[in-house]
């Protein structure tokens, strides 16, 4: 609610439109009744959105679970440009690889599968379905944050190559949210500060 309030206030002050997108990619934990309750809570607080959610609008669908074809199209584009690659690491493999860094809370993926040969990939594909990771380029990324000002991060070092499509074929939040923001014309994103750490 905190993020919703601040984004609503910011958008209304600027004369913009407040969009409600339901980020329900995790079908195990996200049920439609939760989204309905969120809408009821926002209405009760007087935070009325201009489009999205059950209200609909021109840039929908607004439920990410209904946008798989859109994500597939952009996934294929990334694949054609060589910006993603298959990863055959299991969760157990990743836990072992990050064990020395467990006290850090999050250890970036060490790009174990990034430079596999086609022969190695074909052999691993016989054993398990891969997830797909974005090949994060080296170098610093800079952006302006409304609260923290100019921010600079070495994304390869701090995040590593992140999953864009899980081994079960479901698209990851990291791909979906970027595609949706671009296609829906989102110009301001209000998130918790945990995403900056």
For every predicted segment, state its role:
Residues 86, 91-197:
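Active-site cores that bind ATP or allylic diphosphates and position pyrophosphate for catalysis
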Residues 1-102, 193-197:
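N-terminal Rossmann-like or analogous alpha/beta NTP/dinucleotide-binding catalytic cores
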């Amino acid at each position: 609610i905190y993020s919703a309030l601040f984004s609503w206030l910011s958008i209304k002050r600027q004369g913009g439109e407040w969009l409600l997108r339901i980020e329900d990619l995790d079908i195990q934990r996200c049920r439609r009744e939760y989204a309905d309750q969120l809408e009821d809570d926002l209405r009760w607080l007087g935070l009325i959105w201009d489009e999205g959610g059950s209200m609909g609008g021109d840039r929908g669908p607004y439920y990410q679970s209904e946008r798989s074809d859109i994500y597939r199209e952009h996934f294929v584009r990334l694949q054609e440009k060589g910006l993603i690659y298959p990863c055959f690491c299991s969760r157990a493999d990743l836990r072992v690889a990050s064990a020395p860094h467990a006290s850090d809370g999050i250890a970036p993926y060490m790009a174990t599968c990034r430079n596999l040969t086609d022969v190695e990939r074909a052999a691993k594909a016989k054993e398990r379905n891969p997830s797909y990771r974005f090949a994060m380029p080296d170098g610093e990324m800079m952006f302006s944050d409304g609260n923290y000002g100019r921010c600079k991060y070495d994304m390869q070092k701090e995040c590593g190559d992140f999953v864009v499509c899980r081994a079960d074929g479901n698209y990851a939040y990291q791909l979906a949210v970027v595609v949706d923001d671009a296609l829906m014309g989102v110009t301001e994103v209000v998130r918790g500060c945990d995403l900056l750490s």
